[in-house]
Structure formats: structure tokens, C-alpha cells
Amino acid sequence: MNAAVILIIGIVILALGYVFYGGWLSKQWGIDPSRTTPAHELEDGMDYCPAKAPVLMGHHFSSIAGAGPINGPIQAAVFGWVPVLLWVLIGGIFFVGVHDYGALFASVRNNGQSIGTVVESSIGQKAKRLFIIFSYLTLILVVAAFASIVANTFKATYLESGAVDVAKSAANATTAIISLLFIVLAIFFGFFVYRRNAPLGVSTLIGVVAIAMIMWLGIKWHPIYLSYQTWMIICGIYILVASVTPVWILLQPRDYLSSFLLYAMMLLALIGVVGAHPSLDMPAFTGFVDTVAPTGSSLGYMFPALFVTIACGAISGFHSLVGSGTTAKQLNNEKDAQPIAYGGMLIECVLALVSLCAVAYIWERYKTGEVVTPTVVFATGLSEMLGKVFGAGAVNVTYTLMVLAVSVFCLTSLDTATRLARYMFQEFWLKPGEKVSDPTVTGARKVLCNPYVSTAITVVLGIALGMTGYAKIWPLFGAANQLLAGLGLLAVAAWLGKMGRNNKMFIFPMIFMILVTLTSLVFTIKAQIVGIIAGGQGVAWFYIRGILAVLLVILAIDLVIEGGKAIASNSKKAEQA
């Protein structure tokens, strides 16, 4: 099968899904362009700030994309290209499109508050607190992981003498200096667009040219060689400042400009796949159990592994936090919700399909373990395709661009996750209907709701975990993230039912994702029990992971029972009305 044909057919199906299913959802939910959004009604110049649709699309897309739609499809390719293709297309249109769009819509109709507040209004305060605790701890893990990824991407390599190995450190130093200069560029862009009213089109053109100049400068001049620990501290300081800075200064302009790197990467990828039109030299289906195991560790059974491994690109709970966190507070008009939330997610699905084509192109090297790191697989496959289109000289240049783009998005996801965690932490202490600025928020609650205090607590926890043992509990993240997706679907379904609107499009995806995550957690608990019985060094981590997995199962069951009652009650009221 030709990879270009698969990619083109996939794009057409996703586009049809956006037009017909996305349009149907807008009608079912009652999207109202004349309704004032929280970005205008509650504008404070800090978190609530209306953004033009292209700018907000840049923020939303940069925040949800990251490395997820690259890593997941490549790792899940061990089951064959057909299961990956089907899950990306079906999951994109009927699962994550509904999930992301619904979370944003529900948040906008609840004053831009997070999905936790939606849980409170539709299920109850106890459910809200449980949901926020779970979401906050998941975000702390995300902060730890992405800070560590960024620090590893930037760090220098040292010789035994203690001196910097410049040859081995040059690529990381290049990425570091480009990323830092990118932040400076974003601040200037935000200042001129928002404070000097510079035309967005002209500013964008200048910004894109400046990005190219920064990349050239970074390749030629990279004087920063710092250790992993130093970069972790710098990341901590950066997200501490970035997460309490008004969104127009850094978050909006940086994510908007960052999105052009991703667009450029995707455009080159499409040119590479269509231009080289390679055959898919990998099995269509390998079986219901991972027997390829290129990393030496099998993913296990296709159910639930496929649906947990491919998160971004099919459905990811993190997206509901972004949509109901930062994006909802910047939405200029309700009519922008479909292209940003539903459309942005389907673009991410295209990136997932491109990732599948990349791993298929170098399948023999991947399955033998010669090239296994997803980012390297992605960059290698696509750069070699582009080499066939533009000549051998394009391979190294495009490889560097691919790796750099992924690194930039890890940084954008990092400070977005920190800001989201701050929102969650603040909302946890609020009573029903309260806002952080209300005079009723006093004493310890006022201190804990202070943005600087809540951000500092989040950053300290995240960076400390990143510098110690986050990798030991990271295996739980996949199931936790997909459980968050299932609970997000549950929350919006309950809220729509309470509002008297059609919520049936949420029921099957919700049930399916909760079954997937519970099955995955049961397998995880079983593996930890086996590890505990075997004993040996590191047995304490088997206990920790096992306990956390059991707690996640209990949390899921509790919230499902509470949410199920709310949905059933609302359905009964609707029938009686």
C-alpha cells in the first residue's frame, strides 16, 4: 500500500468529519455567535484575554500537540498500520473531536472555569474535589516529565576531565539558544501586536522571517553549555514567571509563532510523503499481542495498549484541561470553538498519520531496534523522504528542523501545563459560585488562591519530581491520561444532560475509554504484584506504582457512579418534561 494514498484518504476523511459531524455537533449544542464569551465578560488582562482565532488556534494547537501525536502512533505501530490508522480516524472524529470541542464549549458556558467546575455544577462538589485532585497530580507529573525532556534536550555533555564535550553538545546548545531567542521574539511580537496595534498579518510575516533568522543564528552561534540540573532550575524559574505573566505578553504570541514551526514541519512532511510516495513496508496487522517489541519490552495486548499508547492523535485527557483552562479564557467568539477545538484536533490527527508514514518508511530499522526513539524515528523517516524529493543535501537540514520543532512544543506544553495546574489548585479551594477575586475568599484560602503562591507550589512539586523519580511512576501516565479523557467525557455528558441538550454522542466514547483505562490499570496492578513477589532491588517502586494504580481504579469507580447517577437523573427529568 502506498503511504501517500493512505495519507490523502485519511486527510479527506478527517475533513469530511469536521464539516459534517463537527457541524452537526455545533447545531446540537446551540453554538451562539452573538453570545458574549468569558474572554470579554471577565477580561482582566491576565488570564481572560480575547484572542483572534488564528492566534488562539496557535496557542491551542501548540499546547495539545507536543510530542504526543508523534510518539503514540510510532510506538503503537507494532500492531500494524491498519489498527493505528483506524484508531486515529475513528478516535479523531468520534472520540477526541467530541471530547475537546465539548470541554471547551462547557467551559465557555461556565465562565471559562476548568472542567472541574463543570463537574461540580453537573455532578456535585465531592466529585469536583476528586476530579481536581486527580487532574492536578496528573499535571504535576506532566510538568516533571516535560521539564526533564527540555533539560535533556538542552544539556551539555561533559568529558571525564569535567570540560564540555563541544562536539557532542553542539546540537543541544543550538536547540537551547534558539528556544531562548524564540521567547524574546515572542515578547516583542506580543508588545507590538497588543500594545502598539500592529497589523497581525504584517507582524506574522516579520515574525516568521525572524524565526528563520533565529534558527540560522542558533546553528552558527550556540555559546550556552549547561548541565541537566542547571537547566531544570532554569525551567523552573521560566515556568514560574511565564505562568503568572499576562497571556498577551508571552503565552499567546509564543504559541502563535511556535505553531508556524509545526505548520512548516507538517507541510514538509506532506511534501515528503506525497513526493516520495513510498510503499508501507510494514505489516497491515501483526496480531493482538505485541511480538515486535523493538525496545525489548512488549506493549502487551492490543486492547488496551493501542488505545492507551495513541493518546494525542486519537483522544487525550490533557486536551480537556487545555480547552477548559487557557483556551476557554481567550475565546473571542463561540463560532471560533469548532475550528479551534474540533479542527485543531483533526490537524493533530494528520500529524499522527504522518508519524505512521515515517515509521513505516524505516520499518526494518525500527523493528530491529536500530532506531527506536520516536522523535528520531519521525525525523529520520521524513528527512530521508525529503532527501528523495529535494536531494541528499536536504536530509540534515530537515532532520534538524523536525527535532527542533518537537523540542519547541515540549517547552510550550510545559508552561501551559503549569498554568493549568495553577488554575486547578486555585479552584480546589473555592466554594460553589466563588471566584478567586471575591471578598468571601479570606484567610488561608486567600493565600492558597494567590496566583504566585499556587504557581510556586506547583513549580516546586513539578521540578522536584522531575529531578528525582518521575520516570519510576511515568508508566502510569498513559492510563491516567486516558482515564482523564473518560472522566472529561462523563463530566460534559452530565452537564449537557442537565442543560437539556443532546449528550448521546458522549455515551459510547465515555464507556469505551473508562473500560480501556480500567483494563490497563488492572494489568498494571498485576505487573506490580509480580514484581513485588519477585523482590530484589527497586521493589519499593512496585509497591508505589501498585498503590497508585489501585487508587486510580477506586477514583474512577467513584466518579463513574456519581456521574452515572447524574446522567440517569437528568435523562429521567428530560423524559418527564
Task: State where each predicted segment sits.
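Extracellular/periplasmic helix-exit of transmembrane alpha-helices
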Residues: 273-291, 346-381, 416
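Membrane-helix boundary/coupling elements in multi-pass transport proteins
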Residues: 67-74, 91-99, 103, 107-111, ...
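Hydrophobic alpha-helical segments and their helix-loop junctions in multi-pass secondary transporters
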Residues: 194-195, 209-233, 241-243, 263-291, ...
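Membrane-interface helix-loop-helix modules in multi-pass membrane proteins
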Residues: 49-110, 121-125, 138, 142-158, ...
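Loop-to-transmembrane helix boundary motifs in multi-pass membrane proteins
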Residues: 125-140, 343-350, 393-398, 427-467
